[in-house]
Regions:
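Extended, structured, electrostatic nucleic-acid-contact surfaces
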Residues: 48-56, 266
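Short, P/G- and charge-enriched loop/turn segments at secondary-structure junctions
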Residues: 121-123
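Major-groove recognition helix of helix-turn-helix-like DNA-binding domains
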Residues: 55-75, 83
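Single, function-defining residue in the core of a domain
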Residues: 1-40, 44, 73, 80-84, ...
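Noncatalytic carbohydrate-binding groove/subsite architecture in carbohydrate-active enzymes
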Residues: 96
Length: 266
């Protein structure tokens, strides 16, 4: 698979020694051994040169040729290979702990602070640089299947635009992702969402289901989003579930476009 991708993207064109495979192994070793920089990685490789050569790192690995390879080679070689490995890992790690048909994903972001003088391209604040990692996480297999990197000042909700929604899969979001136009895109993709509602959600109840309050479910309602613009952004019925988390003494409200799962499952 990797060789085919290298051929597809001309990764080894005019390369004599340091191939794409050598580059991949070097970078994997750097990640697995928690190297802090390319300089740190090269020092370790040079210290164990005979072993590193037999491990497939190639000969005469230098910071210069590794840096040039990272900068100039087509990233699609490694992205496509990573996606291939993720699919294999998902199949091997799959379990049905949720007892729900369909893949369950959680989507959230993390901000990583960086040194402005080094990472000038990731300008965040006056004296600070930073990036934001938007991660789609497969709950069943415990594997991140998609990571989108943006500047740190990009709002979380914008990252929803790059998700390729799978039919009949479930997507879990926190309150930062309440955007009815974007949530409606999930519905039109034949996928499901469960999102924590904001406290000021405008909701017009149509009817309610009976609930057992001893389970923590306060109510299970079906209705429509109220509001001149928001009702146009999400014109279809939506479900609202209120739940009391006894362990954390917290009241939670969820919105979903799934009407088949029990309120407890939501």
């Amino acid at each position: 698979i990797f060789d085919r991708l290298v051929t597809k993207y001309n990764g080894n064109k005019s390369v004599k020694h340091f191939t794409c495979w050598n580059q991949l192994l070097c970078m994997l070793f750097g990640q697995l051994s928690s190297r802090e920089s390319l300089r740190d990685l090269i020092i370790v490789i040079e210290a164990h040169q005979s072993k590193s050569y037999h491990l497939g790192f190639g000969k005469n690995v230098t910071r210069s040729n590794l840096s040039k390879a990272n900068e100039n080679r087509n990233f699609k070689i490694f992205e496509d290979f990573a996606n291939h490995l993720i699919l294999i890992a998902q199949e091997k790690n799959s379990n049905d702990s949720f007892e729900i048909k369909g893949t369950v994903y959680a989507f959230d972001s993390s901000t990583i602070d960086l040194c402005l003088s080094v990472f000038w391209w990731a300008h965040f604040r006056k004296t600070k640089a930073g990036i934001k990692l938007h991660t789609l996480f497969d709950i069943n297999t415990q594997i991140p299947v998609f990571i989108h990197i943006t500047e740190a000042n990009v709002h979380d909700v914008n990252a929803m635009d790059v998700i390729k929604y799978e039919p009949f899969a479930y997507y879990i979001f926190d309150r930062a992702y309440v955007d009815y136009l974007r949530l409606y895109r999930i519905t039109k993709s034949d996928a499901y969402f469960v999102v924590r509602a904001k406290s000021n959600v405008k909701f017009k109840r149509m009817y309610s289901k009976k609930t057992d309050k001893s389970t923590g479910v306060i109510y299970d309602q079906t209705g429509k989003i109220d509001g001149f613009y928001t009702s146009k952004d999400y014109p279809e019925k939506i479900r609202k579930v209120k739940f009391f988390d006894a362990e954390n003494k917290k009241m939670l409200i969820f919105l979903t476009n799934n009407f088949d799962l029990s309120a407890q499952q939501i």
